[in-house]
Structure formats: C-alpha cells, structure tokens
UniProtKB/Swiss-Prot annotation:
Keywords: Calcium, Carbohydrate metabolism, Disulfide bond, Glycoprotein, Glycosidase, Hydrolase, Metal-binding, Signal
Gene name linked to the record: SWA2
Signal peptide: 1-20
Cofactors named for this entry: Ca(2+)
Family: Belongs to the glycosyl hydrolase 13 family.
Protein name: Alpha-amylase 2
Residue numbers marked as site, Transition state stabilizer: D329
The UniProt record lists the keyword Chloroplast: no
Phylogenetic placement of the source organism: Eukaryota, Fungi, Dikarya, Ascomycota, Saccharomycotina
GO biological process per UniProt: carbohydrate catabolic process
Presence of keyword Amino-acid biosynthesis: no
Coiled coil feature spans: none
UniProt binding sites for substrate: W115, H154, R236, K241, H242, G266, D329, R376
UniProt-listed Gene3D superfamilies: Glycosidases (3.20.20.80), Golgi alpha-mannosidase II (2.60.40.1180)
Organism (species): Schwanniomyces occidentalis (Yeast)
Length: 507
C-alpha cells in the first residue's frame, strides 16, 4: 500500500494470519477512533422535509414538482426510529439543519437545506434546536449515530449573482468573504471549480473564500460548537471538491468527528486524494460502474471488477468510503429498471461492499423518482410498510453484516477478495478465515439462472447458509463452493458457526 501504518510489526504479522487484505491505517484521522468507529455503521440517508411529519400523517400531499416544504420534521424522525432501526441501520444522515433563504425561487423553496442564509440559526421548518437535541439523544439511547449534512462552499441568493445583498447573511455579511462573481465554466480547471460559483442566475450560490484565514476560523469555531451543542457523530460535507483543500485539515480537527465529503467525480485518481484532507468521501467512482452493471442485463462485470481494484490502489482507506446506489442528486435505480432481481442485487452489493453502506430513504419502498426533484418523494405516502420485499432484504443484509461485526470487531477493516468475476456474476469474500462471508451478485435479471463454482477459504465439507433464503449448503471437498442462481437472486453465504445462536435463519 502507498500509505503509512500505525500498526506495530507484531500486529501486522497477526493481521496477515486472519485476513487476505488487512487494512493499513494512516497516521492521521483514518486511524482515529472518531473515523474508525464509522466503519461498522450502516447509514440511512433521509431528506428531513420528506421523511416524517410531526402529526404522523400518511396522506398529506407532497408534489415533488412543486419544490415546496412538505412538513417533515425532527420530531417526525424521532417517531419513526423504530422503522429505521427495524432495517438494521445504526446511523442516520439528515439534511442540513441551518436557516435557509426564505424565498420562493425559480427552483422553489430551500426544503432540501442547501441554500444557507444563517449558519447560527436552525431551520424552523424542521423544528427547534431542542427538537434537534432530542433527536440526537433518542438516537444515542438506541446506540445509533447522527450524521448531519453541512455546506461550507456557498450561501444562496434568489436571483443573479451580480445582485447579491451580502448584508442579509450571518456571519459572512460582507462581499469580502466571497469570491468575485463568476460561474463555473470548466470542470477540468480546479481553480475554476474552487473559486467560481455553482448555481446560475435563477438561484446563485455565492462562493466563500474558504482559503482565507478569517473564513476558515469562523467555520472552525462554528463546527466545533455545532458538534458539541447537538452531540453530532459525523458530518457529510456538500460540494467538497469546490472548497480549497487547505481548508479541510483544520476543519477536520475542529470538528473532531468523521467527515464524509461529497466529491462528485467518478475518477478515483481525482476522488481518492481527498482522503488526505478528510476521513472519507462519497464513492462516486464505484457508483457509476455499479449503476451500469445493475440497471440492466447487458453489461458484463468487467468494469465493476476493475473499479474495485482501482479503488484499492488509489484510495488511502476504502473502508471509510461512503457507498451508495441512490441519493438525493441521482435518479433512483427503479427509474432505470423495474426488475426486482436487479434492484435487490444492487442493494445487497451496496450493503456488503467494502466501505460504509448508505441507503437512501425510499429504497426500501421501491420508490422510482428520476432526477431532482422527483427523487425526493414523501415517505409517509408509503405508509411506512415493513412488509415490502426491499425493506425485508435490507433488514436481512444489515443483520448478517451486523452479526459479522459482532463476532469480529475487525470485520470491517478487512478488504474483500474477488473470488469470481466473469460474465454477469461476481463473488466477494470478506472476513477472518474461520468466519468469512461469501456474497454472490449478478445482473442476470428475474428470468436468469446460472451455476458457478469457485474457490473459497471454507474447509472442505463446511456447512454454510444463504442468509437470504436460509438454504443450507456445504463447501465441496476441494474448498470450492457451487452456487446455483435462480430468478437472478443474490446470495450471501455465512458459515453456520458465524450465525449460531443469532436468530438468523432460526440458528
């Protein structure tokens, strides 16, 4: 690996006995307890305004095309924590919580939370500061974590960039805190990306001079206070690649928690270096080949397999990347395909891959909204069904992942071995030698079937269980495993010893 280790020689020797690819930790935040603790989390991302209302309504109108506040609140989230925890999630990621511009713009209202006006005030549409504290407290009572989305790149203005009234902002209330107005025109020019503005002249996004010490000092004091006041466990940073990289080291130190930066780029050579400045980044390099593989039955697994290898080579710590197949910026997977087998494979792959899994609210109900704003539906209109097949799948996959972590606290530090990658099937193996989980994914589709055999680290004749069907199998005498795929379903095999007395599949 290309980065330093904080493990002793003895520890390295021991780790090599139990894992084919032990993770080597960097000297800085990747090895800190704040970041390391997030490896074992499974995150449920939600849009606060669209998840749950205080009145508990399951019929309140919410037309996504109107781009208005629909009434979701912090209290609504609290009231539905059983629903989230029932899927096995251990953390939630909520929308930015600070005060937004109040205008009805050409793109609607700031219900999403990315159009800041005052970083010291809470968005009253979501509730009060006490409501947010209560949400944090209720999560921690359940041993769950709170991740809050934040924006450090820009504020917002209803209108042209040339007409911004900076005095309306708090605390950055002078033009001198912001870059001169210019829209981004060249995403291959990093200076243009960092110093010019996102947005347009309908809603302009005044770009902060985060490279200036006065701006960074204010943000550092603010984030330390935010984390302390609301007992926040992690932060997701919007538009991270648009902020000067020198801003992040002191900000990471001031925050003192896991930082997940949105680096909206599919090239690992561009995305991975951001781990030099913050704990983790959203895994867009994996997202694109994952989407292309699981959105239909025509693509082979070659591109996805190659990206897994590239991430291992280019990233400092793949176990701190945030993996996703849907989010608030991308069309939902069911907008590309209605094949439930493909969707289930994508969900299971996302949850079992190396890194921190993130599921976007509504995936468990099969929501199919395409681009923003259609992918920001009101979840209450689903009735919060717990009988949906996707809800049950997510629960089952999180359950085996959580069991693996319970049995071996180092499980999430191991890198997966690709046991098989050919045609339309990929098999991954992860964990210590005596507790390895083998996951088999495909894009054969609901009418597809195939039988594959590949080598594993299982002992000859070892009893294994597909935790998604509860069917028992045995490793072959030569330690290979024969897997029969029917109906294009994913398979996740665990040694019977791993799930003993867990309740999984009645063991």
């Amino acid at each position: 690996m290309k980065f330093a280790t904080i493990l002793s020689t003895t520890a390295l020797a021991l780790s090599s006995l139990v894992a084919s690819k032990p993770i080597f930790l960097s000297k800085r935040d990747a090895g800190s307890s704040a970041a390391a603790a997030w490896r074992s989390e499974s995150i449920y991302q939600l849009v606060t305004d669209r998840f749950a209302r205080t009145d508990g309504s399951t019929s309140a109108t919410c037309n996504t095309g109107d781009r208005v506040y629909c009434g979701g609140t912090f209290q609504g989230i609290i009231d539905k924590l059983d629903y989230i925890q029932g899927m096995g999630f251990t953390a939630i990621w909520i929308s930015p919580v600070v005060e937004q511009i109040p205008d009805d713009t050409g793109y609607g209202y700031a219900y999403h939370g990315y159009w800041m006006k005052d970083i010291y005030a809470i968005n009253s549409n979501f509730g009060t500061a006490d409501d947010l504290k209560n949400l944090s407290n209720e999560l921690h009572k359940r041993n769950m974590k709170l991740m809050v989305d934040i924006v450090t790149n820009h504020y917002a203005w209803n209108g042209a960039g040339s007409s911004v009234a900076y005095s309306n902002y708090n605390p950055f209330n002078q033009q001198s805190y912001f870059h001169d107005y210019c829209l981004i025109t060249n995403y291959d020019d990093q200076t243009n990306v960092e110093d010019c503005w996102e947005g347009d002249n309908t809603v302009s996004l005044p770009d902060l001079r985060t490279e200036d010490s006065d701006v960074s000092s204010i943000f550092n004091l603010w984030v330390a206070e935010l984390v302390s006041n609301y007992s926040i466990d992690g932060l997701r940073i919007d538009s991270a690649k648009h902020v000067d990289e020198s801003f992040y080291p002191s900000f990471q130190s001031a925050a003192g928690v896991y930082l997940l930066g949105e680096v909206y780029d599919g090239d690992p050579a561009y995305t991975c270096p951001y781990q030099n400045y913050m704990s983790g980044v959203t895994n867009y390099p994996l997202y694109y080949p994952m989407l292309r593989f699981f959105q239909g039955t025509s693509n082979s697994v070659d591109e996805l397999n190659a990206m897994i290898s590239s991430l291992e080579s280019d990233c400092k710590d793949i176990t701190l990347l945030g993996n996703f197949i849907e989010n608030h910026d991308q069309p939902r997977l069911p907008s590309y395909t209605s094949d439930s087998a493909l969707i289930k494979n994508a969900i299971a792959f996302n949850l079992m891959s190396d890194g921190i899994p993130i599921i976007y609210y509504g995936q468990e109900q099969g929501y199919s909204g395409s681009s923003d704003p259609n992918n920001r539906e009101a979840l209450w209109l689903s009735g919060y069904s717990t009988s949906n097949g996707y809800y049950k799948l997510i629960s089952s996959v999180n359950q085996i992942r959580n069991q693996a972590i319970y049995k071996d606290s180092k499980y999430t530090t191991y890198w997966s071995d690709v046991l098989y990658a050919s045609g339309h099937v990929i098999a991954l193996q992860r964990g210590a030698d005596d507790q390895r989980i083998v996951s088999v994914f495909n894009n054969l589709g609901s009418s597809g079937s195939q039988t594959v055999t590949f080598s594993t680290k299982y002992s000859g004749g070892e009893k294994v269980v597909d935790v998604l069907t509860c069917q028992t199998s045995y490793a072959n005498s030569d330690s290979t495993l024969t897997v029969s795929i029917s109906g294009g379903a994913p398979r996740i095999y665990a040694p019977a010893s791993l799930i003993a007395n867990s309740g999984i599949c009645n063991f």
